[in-house]
């Protein structure tokens, strides 16, 4: 089966994290705060990142995933879920997984955000429990990594998503639409499911 993991620049965050506004924090003076961000741009700078702040760019990606893949997962910011759900036709079966990130730092909101949703389309024939060797949960708690790439996912996150998709290295191919740090591709290359990775 053809599977895909899509971890695009998050809607409403792309220009700030990856584009020309990379050093403009919502806590910065431009937004009425006092935070100062300094340092060099991370390795994942893209001059056209702002196009991912437009919902139609995400819609085109969703349409591609639906037409080209048997199963897929889309990572997103907590405030993106409301925008994404209407992009997916009701006839397309999906699940929403939750990645809990226990060590997040305070942002501009009073309520601390500690999770990111992942929309998953589990391939046909892999949704029922019949004949399953593993039963992944739809939520997982995994610490973030700080490797210089904004939004990089830890290896265990990739394992969890692959487990939800029912990944079988003998018969499946997996595309990583946004290679970024290379962490997703590195985990896919291992090929063997770690049955205890995401509990």
Task: Explain the meaning of each model-derived region.
Residues 1-175, 179-199:
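Class I S-adenosyl-L-methionine-dependent methyltransferase catalytic core
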């Amino acid at each position: 089966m053809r599977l895909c993991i899509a971890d695009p620049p998050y809607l409403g965050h792309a220009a700030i994290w990856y584009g020309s506004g990379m050093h403009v924090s919502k806590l910065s003076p431009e937004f009425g705060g006092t935070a100062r961000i300094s340092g060099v741009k991370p390795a994942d700078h893209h001059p056209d990142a702002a196009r991912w702040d437009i919902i139609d760019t995400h819609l085109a990606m969703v349409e591609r995933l639906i037409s080209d893949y048997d199963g897929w997962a889309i990572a997103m910011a907590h405030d993106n879920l409301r925008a994404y759900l209407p992009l997916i036709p009701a006839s397309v079966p999906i699940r929403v997984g939750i990645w809990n990130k226990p060590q997040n730092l305070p942002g501009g909101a009073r309520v601390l955000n500690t999770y990111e949703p992942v929309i998953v389309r589990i391939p046909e024939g892999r949704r029922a429990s019949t004949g399953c060797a593993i039963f992944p949960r739809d939520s997982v708690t995994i610490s973030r990594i700080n490797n210089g790439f904004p939004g990089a996912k830890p290896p265990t996150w990739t394992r969890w998503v692959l487990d939800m998709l029912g990944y079988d290295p003998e018969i499946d191919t997996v595309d990583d639409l946004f290679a970024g740090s290379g962490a997703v591709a590195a985990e896919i290359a291992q090929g063997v499911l770690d049955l205890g990775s995401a509990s």
